[in-house]
């Protein structure tokens, strides 16, 4: 019993940092309120109209991660949060967004993220480690854009360590990989579930996305 408890505790890391920097130290200290280039007092509300950056004037699906069809411009960026968020006044640095902490292993073969307890999807459910693993498994699966399999080629797998802790294992040491997996869009396991059964991802077409981003 004691040995099993010790083994379980050994799987969960001592926590690292609020940010991950490829070079040097993060510019912003833990607990910072906003990036320097952001106007924290900017008025809220109103309507924002964005012009598509593609030669597409319409859309026929809400799923931006599958091959067939066209989704609205910027949908992925506006509706789905990521584990880390890059700052625009630094090079190769990510700060915790869905994740409150990130730890890169000393041997470079894994990165572990602890999720914020207050992180919620648009349906009110908490963002859990199982959702992160589900998002990864779905994006590298046969029904998603093949570019994701290329992007995550050096990821060996994803482990759910506990409800709020997820670990990405790497095939070989690469200091950029924590930033790569930190940018994965996270969506709910409930997205595409119909009558209690999950549809194949390429059949999730007009189902309203269940993300945690600023827009829904």
Q: Over which residues does each language-model region extend?
A:
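Surface-exposed binding/hinge segments that line
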Residues: 114, 150-195, 214
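N-terminal cofactor/phosphate-binding cores enriched in small/glycine residues
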Residues: 107, 111-113
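Sec-exported extracytoplasmic/periplasmic mature domains
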Residues: 37, 84-88, 107, 120, ...
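Bacterial N-terminal signal peptides
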Residues: 2-10
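Alpha-helical secondary-structure segments
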Residues: 49, 128-135, 163-169, 213-214
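N-terminal lobe/hinge region of extracytoplasmic solute-binding protein
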Residues: 15-107, 137, 208-214
